[in-house]
Design a protein with these regions (language model features):
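Active-site acidic/histidine proton-transfer and metal-coordination neighborhood
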Residues: 288, 320-413, 498
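Hydrophobic faces of well-ordered beta-strands that scaffold small-molecule active sites
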Residues: 257-262, 289-291, 313-318, 342-344, ...
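Acidic-and-aromatic substrate-binding clefts and catalytic sites of carbohydrate-active enzymes
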Residues: 266-272, 288-300, 318-326, 350-353, ...
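Bacterial Sec-dependent N-terminal signal peptides
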Residues: 1-22
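Carbohydrate-interacting regions of secretory-pathway proteins
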Residues: 20-257, 307
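N-terminal pre-domain/capping segments
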Residues: 246-341
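Acidic/histidine-rich catalytic cores of soluble enzymes
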Residues: 375-470
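Conserved, mostly hydrophobic/aromatic
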Residues: 261, 281, 289, 306, ...
Length: 511
């Protein structure tokens, strides 16, 4: 009897879940969402190059819109389908399910008046890639993975930490368009962000398959498209919310100002061409930099380059030996940069052997340097944690010892979120414990599945875009706001900074 009742309950629950497909909740209706597929008809759609819905190649069955298989060729069966309406600012949400080896796409800003091609092909538009990365050869074409699932096809790859589900399971794609700002989301996680029409966007187009198409991706409005690529792909819960343009000057509900970035994030390009890299950083919407290197320049030269671009340096990072042996030079460089803080991020020690003697020496040196910097130059000294300090010591950790024995008048702290989390400490707990001792923060995320330790090191590919890793960044920022953090800096040590930093910045703006 129990099994029978359980089975009936399961069936009822399944029926209830299925009944919610292709419907809007009361909350969604209130927010302005509209269905683009009712689960029964193809109302609201037509062929990309014909004035009616295709007679073949597409099927509505069991509440699903399906691309019928036809050998994997592009638009040779029914062809693509597009909406009857143009859109500009919007949030689009689509559930899709891939079959093995399948390829499709969700396109936006599609010009409905584009010429009909002489040979079958997909209609032109910006494409959210829908692909079986493991089995379809297109995943290995293009550049740096820019043809993999959720990428902006042939232009920008999605972050490597994207949460794609297994073939045969339902994924949710979301595209957000606000003016020229566009975001791709996969299963509730932002995986890509870019600015249509920016110099960076135009440069990518110039190196892509779209290079000979004038004005590609620059239309003010356009249709939405589901692609027929000759493989079986299912769609459901296709819905859109038209939005009003929001100027991209907001920092988010939690952050009062748009965060900055650590120069180490762009260390390689800054070393090669400092001014061009500053231009790129500003184009991303970042104007506050913590410099941890002068990159072969004089501090005054960097300040001049920053001033010319309306940018600033609020913190200057230097090495431990320099605060001991070159404190005057450090202070003068910080002042020349316009910084208010001087930061040290590493206490020299033998690998795997951080001792109380080392901690005591650091406390002595930090107190001395902090006193000089404050009293002689009006600068605030900060120590930046790196993981090894959280090894147990007496009833706490070496970090607790450093906190307890440094003079709060002269020594403050910069929290590196990843290097708190990596050795197993909750950043929120630490912020609550030491509150106002923190003045600066490096905002970073750690790839899911990575188990940390006290080494103070991890592979650079374990730095992932904010919101895609293990750390509850929203909770950290909320706690940090209460502690009085003055400057937040995005730091990303990976090789994918040009992909990940825009995602991280957009993520923070959503908080």
């Amino acid at each position: 009897m129990f099994r029978l009742i359980a089975g009936v309950c399961t069936l009822l629950l399944t029926a209830q879940v299925n009944a919610q497909d292709n419907q809007l909740s009361a909350k969604e209706k209130k927010e302005g969402w509209q269905l683009l597929f009712d689960g029964k008809t193809t109302t609201g759609w037509k062929g990309a190059f014909i004035n009616k819905f295709p007679e073949k190649g597409w099927k509505v069955e069991d509440g699903l819109l399906m691309v019928e298989p036809s050998g994997g060729a592009e638009s040779t069966n029914g062809g693509d389908i597009i909406t009857l309406k143009d859109y500009d600012n919007f949030e689009l949400s689509v559930d899709f399910k891939l079959t093995e080896g399948a390829n499709s796409g969700i396109k936006y800003f599609v010009d409905a008046k584009q010429a009909t091609p002489s040979n079958p092909r997909s209609a032109l538009g910006l494409e959210y890639q829908v692909l079986d990365d493991a089995r379809h050869p297109d995943a290995k074409l293009g550049k740096n993975g820019d043809r993999t699932i959720s990428s902006l096809y042939d232009l920008i790859p999605a972050v490597s930490s994207k949460p794609a589900k297994a073939i045969g399971e339902w994924n949710n794609a979301k595209v957000v368009s606000n003016g020229n700002h566009v975001e791709h989301w996969l299963n509730g996680i932002m995986v890509l962000a870019y600015e249509r029409g920016s110099d960076a966007f135009k440069a990518l187009v110039a190196e892509s398959k779209y290079k000979d198409i004038p004005g590609f991706g620059l239309g003010k409005m356009g249709r939405l498209l589901l692609q027929d690529h000759g493989n079986k792909v299912y769609f459901k819960n296709i819905k859109i919310k038209e939005t009003k343009f929001m100027p991209d000057t907001r920092s988010g509900r939690l952050l009062k100002e748009i965060p900055g970035v650590v120069s180490y994030t762009f260390r390689n390009s800054l070393q090669k061409n400092l001014t061009a890299t500053l231009d790129s950083i500003k184009a991303m919407g970042l104007t506050n930099i913590e410099f941890s290197n002068l990159f072969g320049k004089k501090a005054a030269e960097i300040k001049e380059a920053l001033d010319a671009r309306g940018m600033k340096c609020t913190s200057f990072g230097t090495g431990y030996p320099d605060i001991v042996n070159k404190i005057t030079e450090v202070a003068e460089n910080a002042k020349a940069l316009g910084a208010s803080f001087v930061r040290v991020a590493w206490i020299p020690h033998d690998k795997g052997n951080f001792t109380i003697e080392t901690a005591k020496k650091a406390v002595e040196d930090f107190n001395k340097a902090g006193k000089i910097l404050k009293e002689n130059y009006g600068l605030t000294f900060c120590y930046h944690n790196h993981g090894y300090e959280f090894q147990p010591y007496e009833n706490g950790t070496f970090y607790d010892y450093i906190m307890a024995n440094t003079n709060p008048d002269y020594v403050s702290f910069e929290m590196d979120v990843l290097w708190v989390f990596h050795p197993g400490i909750n950043p929120v707990d630490l912020l609550k414990k030491y509150g106002s001792r923190y003045k600066l923060m490096h905002v970073k995320d750690l790839r899911k599945g990575i188990v940390g330790n006290f080494s103070g090191g991890t592979a650079i590919e374990n730095d992932v875009a904010l919101g895609t890793g293990q750390i509850d960044i929203a909770a950290v920022i909320k706690a940090a706001q209460k502690s009085g953090i003055q400057n937040y800096y995005i730091e990303d040590e990976s090789k994918d900074v040009n992909i990940q930093v825009p995602v991280s910045l957009s993520f923070l703006k959503h908080l």
